[in-house]
Amino acid sequence: MKIGYKELHIPANADGSPKIDINSLHIWPRGNFMLMGLANLDNSFTCTLFMPIEGENSFESLKSEEQLISFFATYFPDTKEALPDLVRDFFRNPNSYLAIMKCFPWTFNDKVALIGDSSHAIVPFYGHGMNAGFEDITILNEMMQKYGDDWDQIFKAYEISRKPNADAIAELSRRNFEEMSAKTADTNFLLQKKIEKWFSDKHPEKWMPLYSRVTFSLQPYSEALAIGDFQNEIMQEVLKMDNIEDNWNSEEVENKILELLK
């Protein structure tokens, strides 16, 4: 991904209260770039500007104070009061870069095995980089219990098991950036998520939303990705239904999803 990021800061008010809602994840989606705000314990916010490195609307294009102020006035006008130190933070804080790294094999004979980011660095938009590394350790330990001192077999079984899941969480993380930066401003996408939540609440045994499946279950990432793609195909059919905007929580929609799940 040719995307970088830079951290900015929203301080608390003089009386210690937050400038924006403290109980929300704040996202300003703008297509191929976005601003995100996460609350801190002191009622301040750490904001992150994710943006292409080069091209129009990129870090490369914001070289002067005037360009920066004009850019924020155009795309994030409601942050003017919240970011009093925008210019200082932007030009003082470093640009960092996002990367997805895939490789194989992860092992060399019975001597060395790569684990975690050394074998599958991913972008942070699912928050699962560390969890994926812990899963590596879990599977490696299982193979050690299964194959004893046969490290060649341990390593082979470990990398074969983990590679598809590492690739899957890399893809899920990449897609989540696209969802946050662009689709959260799309009315059809928001309607889809509303229908999924409604149907899942009614039929939790039949439908777990993709994000919940990845984050709150022990299901392998590769299975979660495949099921999520299947669910998305169903939802694209549901969104084609007549008057879906008004009838999104109707019995007709419920029956349609149940039929497509068969």
Predicted features and spans:
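Conserved FAD-binding catalytic core of PHBH/FMO-like flavoproteins
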Residues: M1-L98, K102-F108
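Conserved short hydrophobic patches within well-ordered secondary structure
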Residues: I20, Q67, D117, I122, ...
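A structural signal for well-ordered alpha-helical segments within the folded catalytic domains
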Residues: E66, E135-T138, K193
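Conserved mid-domain beta->alpha element of the FAD-binding
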Residues: L8, P94-A185
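C-terminal helical "tail/cap" subdomain of flavin- and related membrane-associated enzymes
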Residues: E142-K262
